[in-house]
Amino acid sequence: IDPTSKDSQPSLERAAWVAKRSQSAVELLICEYNSALDGGFFFDGPAQQKARESLLNNLSIWLDKLAQPLRDDGLTVTTEVRWGKPLHSMVLQRIDELKPDLVFRDATTHSLLQRLFFNNTSWQLIRQCPVPLWLVRKGEWKAERMCAALDPVHSADTEAVLDHLLVESTAHLAKTL
């Protein structure tokens, strides 16, 4: 879940849509980091820790508010808020712990400068996520077509384990949805 986008959460909407049709559970995850609350000059140790805990608590409350309508619809929804950086490592750590069947992430557009000089979380997840990753854009999806992006080179995975998992997952989703 993107804590900077209070209005729209496309990945949440898509995850709920898929969960309803597949009778799956959902976990909503926020990974947060703010350098001002981590060894910054603005706070002493105890005040810094209190500010960080307050931020994480507020995010947890907000996440529970997002989860409640899904729970009211009968879905099993858990929430998790984590602190750390880089964000993609925090997400991958939770994926390793939870072992989900599918991960949803909002697809965002980045400027040329951001693409050239920064390793954003989405790109890192595309490269490193050990389970199928569904990048979600705003707007309704009509479920008419599905496409799985595979790695034709397999430099890190000689047996193409993830590719086989992607094909199987996509075929299963196509039948289910």
Locations of the language-model features?
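Structural beta-alpha unit
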Residues: D7, K65-V103, H110
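A structural micro-motif
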Residues: S24, L75-V77, V131
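A general structural detector for well-ordered alpha-helical segments in enzyme core domains, enriched
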Residues: W62, L66, T121, L125, ...
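Gly/Ser-rich helix-loop-strand patches that form or flank binding pockets
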Residues: W17-R21, S89-R145
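Small/aliphatic-rich secondary-structure junction motif
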Residues: I1-A47, R145-L177
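A conditional alpha-helix N-cap/helix-loop micro-motif detector
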Residues: S8, S60, G84-K85, R115, ...
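A short acidic, glycine-rich active-site loop
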Residues: A47-I61
